[in-house]
């Protein structure tokens, strides 16, 4: 061999460290892990630990912001059982049965929260408040009386209504009502009343509802049936209004679309619009402005979903005289 001589040195180092045992071993020995988290359980501000909640018999109240915070975590979900009850979790498994009371607050059976892992309880406790407004009537009916309400949450029907309208428009008129933009599915998942924790949240909710309904209307396709006059340009809502006016009175068609028009106008509500214009838009949706924001958010979603189903019924009867 020629060139510089190289050397390779190999060695090993062994080191022994003694690890003293912890006071408890929840993973290896299955010891109970004390949860150092405390919840307000009554009007006087009494606090109880997460472990003590598993004894049952109590209820907890949370700010509505809790739901959006949980849903911001990967693997989370929100399912609806009735108008004011559902299941929510920040993890793929499980789910806490919750209810919404008359003040728009979240109420939960304390025992259910007590069984959550510590990392999840750390999220929940951050939104815990003293009891106010009573237990959700529908949650109490389901968990105490075993008589679940027969009501429905509009959030659970947004995507279904859109899909059924598209199917019926294709069947009856051979047109595509909605374009089905690839982002619509994700936006629909984010549409829920808990976005409306304040006026800004209400406007943000309106913006997303407008995106999945108004902005996604396939104007070109619908105008194959509702043809605008020469040199006249119709927007999305005017096109749908004139489509409906083929089968019903034009004034009725305008009334059907009024809530969706109101939502479309509110999408710019945070852009310093005159307060009179904003209130007129809320009036079109028939939102009671004296109610909690969460309830106003519910009314907004309900009005739009209800009118989508009115449009669907008209399409289904298109060929009938």
Region roles according to the model:
Residues 1-89, 95-97, 105-262, 298-321:
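Amphipathic alpha-helical interface elements
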Residues 102, 112, 274:
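A broadly conserved detector of short glycine/acidic/proline-rich loop/turn motifs that flank catalytic sites
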Residues 231-232, 282, 289-292:
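Short, low-complexity, polar/charged sequence segments that are solvent-exposed and flexible
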Residues 254-283:
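Histidine-centered, metal-coordinating catalytic motifs and their short helical/loop contexts
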Residues 278-286, 316-320:
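Structured alpha-helical bundle/scaffold domains in large eukaryotic membrane-trafficking regulators
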Residues 286-303:
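Short secondary-structure subsegments characteristic of cysteine-rich extracellular domains
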């Amino acid at each position: 061999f020629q060139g510089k001589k190289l050397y390779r040195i190999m060695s090993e180092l062994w080191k022994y460290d003694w690890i003293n045992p912890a006071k408890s071993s929840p993973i290896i020995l299955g010891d109970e892990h004390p949860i150092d988290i405390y919840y307000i359980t009554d009007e006087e501000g009494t606090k109880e630990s997460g472990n003590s909640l598993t004894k049952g018999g109590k209820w907890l109240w949370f700010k509505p912001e809790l739901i959006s915070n949980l849903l911001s975590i990967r693997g989370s979900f929100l399912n609806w059982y009735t108008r004011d009850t559902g299941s929510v979790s920040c993890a793929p498994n499980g789910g806490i049965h919750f209810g919404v009371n008359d003040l728009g607050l979240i109420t939960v059976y304390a025992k259910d929260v007590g069984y959550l892992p510590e990392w999840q309880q750390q999220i929940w406790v951050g939104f815990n408040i003293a009891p106010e407004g009573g237990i959700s009537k529908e949650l109490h009916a389901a968990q105490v009386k075993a008589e679940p309400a027969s009501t429905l949450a509009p959030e659970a029907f947004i995507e279904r209504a859109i899909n059924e309208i598209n199917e019926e428009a294709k069947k009856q008129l051979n047109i595509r009502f909605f374009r089905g933009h690839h982002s619509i599915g994700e936006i629909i998942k984010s549409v829920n009343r808990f976005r409306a924790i304040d006026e800004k949240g209400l406007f943000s909710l309106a913006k997303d509802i407008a995106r999945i309904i108004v902005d996604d209307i396939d104007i070109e396709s619908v105008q194959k049936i509702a043809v605008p006059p020469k040199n006249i340009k119709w927007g999305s809502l005017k096109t749908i209004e004139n489509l409906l006016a083929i089968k019903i009175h034009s004034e009725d068609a305008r009334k059907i679309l009024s809530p969706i028009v109101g939502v479309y106008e509110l999408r710019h509500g945070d852009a310093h619009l005159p307060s009179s214009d904003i209130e007129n838009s809320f009036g079109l949706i028939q939102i009671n402005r004296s109610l909690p924001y969460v309830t106003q958010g519910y009314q907004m979603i309900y009005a739009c979903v209800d009118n989508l189903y009115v449009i669907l019924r008209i399409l289904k009867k298109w060929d009938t005289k």
